Regions:
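Well-ordered alpha-helical scaffold segments within catalytic/enzyme domains
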Residues: 14-26, 40, 53-62, 112-121
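Non-catalytic C-terminal accessory modules of carbohydrate-active enzymes
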Residues: 65-198, 204-210, 214-224
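Extended glycan-interaction surfaces of carbohydrate-active proteins
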Residues: 1-48, 71-91
Length: 225
């Protein structure tokens, strides 16, 4: 079976991505088994769609470094126009290559970066779940959409979130997971959050975040700005 360890097909990991039956918050034995199988696939050669899909899978497995490696591989220029299972990459016009051309890798790449920065399945917003801390030490993202009809902006430095802004558009429950967030969040009424378990917090101590209500966390995990 060793010859299949790095095979591009990964349908046995559908429960990890795009579905969410397998997660770190669920059965940890199953999660670790999925992670082990995924890492055995490696970060090397593959088709465009497979490279894009593995970025998303590694994001769900919280493997930021492997996401980074796969992104670099997916953005490697290729000139092949023949069917080639080892020539995934991009053409000069930034179209994804299987090879030949397919759009799956382009969509998978962008979806994967979003998954690295924000995940919102299983009833919570997970902030920077797969940040490649040695490479993406500083950055910002605006306008990410989360399940529950939230809009999220994140700014980070030294590989730690500095500011998190969340806007609710539907008045649904808002639960955020990020180490240190419990002490640093204010809602529009300047009230602190109530900590549930030190990592997952009901923002503002409320069961639901009212429509249009904004939450702001400054200096997350450090000093409040």
């Amino acid at each position: 079976m060793d010859e299949y360890r790095t095979h591009r097909h990964i349908s046995h990991l559908m429960g990890l991505y795009p579905c969410s039956q397998i997660s770190e918050d669920g059965d940890k034995t199953v999660f670790q088994a999925a992670r082990t199988s995924l890492l055995a696939r490696g970060d090397g050669h593959g088709t465009g769609w497979s490279l894009g899909h593995k970025i998303n899978l590694n994001a769900r497995a919280h493997e930021g470094l492997h996401c980074h490696n796969l992104i670099r591989r997916a953005l490697q220029q290729t000139w092949s126009t023949d069917v080639d299972e080892r020539a995934g990459g991009i053409y000069e016009n930034l179209w994804d290559a299987h090879a030949p051309y397919q759009i799956d890798g382009n969509f998978g790449y962008t979806a994967g970066i979003a998954e690295m920065l924000l995940q919102s399945y299983n009833g919570k917003l997970v902030i920077l779940p797969a940040l490649p801390t040695d490479f993406w030490t500083k950055g910002a993202v605006k306008g990410l959409k989360a399940v529950g009809n939230f809009t999220v902006d994140i700014t980070w430095a030294k590989a730690r979130a500095e500011e998190i802004r969340i806007v609710s558009h539907a008045g649904t429950v808002c639960v955020v997971k990020y180490a240190g967030v419990a002490d640093d969040v204010r809602n529009d009424e300047r009230r602190r959050t109530g900590s549930v378990d030190g990592h997952v917090d009901h923002m503002g101590g409320l069961d639901a975040l009212a429509t249009g209500r904004r939450l702001l966390a400054n200096g997350v995990g450090g000093e409040i700005l």
